[in-house]
């Protein structure tokens, strides 16, 4: 399984409240600044590489329609295929936030919404071995799918060789995070797949523990992949 790096921000804009009809000129709309921030990000999308994903929601846009909002809050997350590129997108996000605040005479702050998730440093010997074990235990093995999510296993993979195989628990084409997928986890096929995965991971762990040459090969492959990530 491949994963994307991820960073989450809570972006808060502060302005000046005023009555939207009686004295709108006295206000500085934090909501307008928040909307402009999202507009600026959208203006950058045509130049995004395919791996860059930026998603956001406005969590607070004011309390009443007849009051110019003095506070607005956005929760956003963005993903890329490497930590190096994540930092580049981070700079773009901050520029858009500061530009929007400046244009609307507001202030802005960015706070981490959660800890960063790193992308996956893939290790070819581990992927090859786990594929062989899964096949030996009767599980159909396919190619590694393009990354569509994030996992803290990516963080682990920047510290030591790691792997996170993805198992199919049903023959039906079900979307994740749905009630249909939840129900599929209760069926015998799902339990058989999980047992197959556990047995395969156990076999791989024993190979790592008992085969010094294999351990060395895994570590060398990991170091090579890590250097490539650092040079992106």
Where do the model's predicted regions map?
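Midchain, well-structured core segments that form catalytic/ion-binding scaffolds
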Residues: 1-128, 132-134, 145-154
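Acyltransferase
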Residues: 136-141
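Zn-dependent metallopeptidase/amidohydrolase metal-coordination segment
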Residues: 142-200, 204-212, 216-232
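Generic surface-pattern signal
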Residues: 102, 135, 223-227
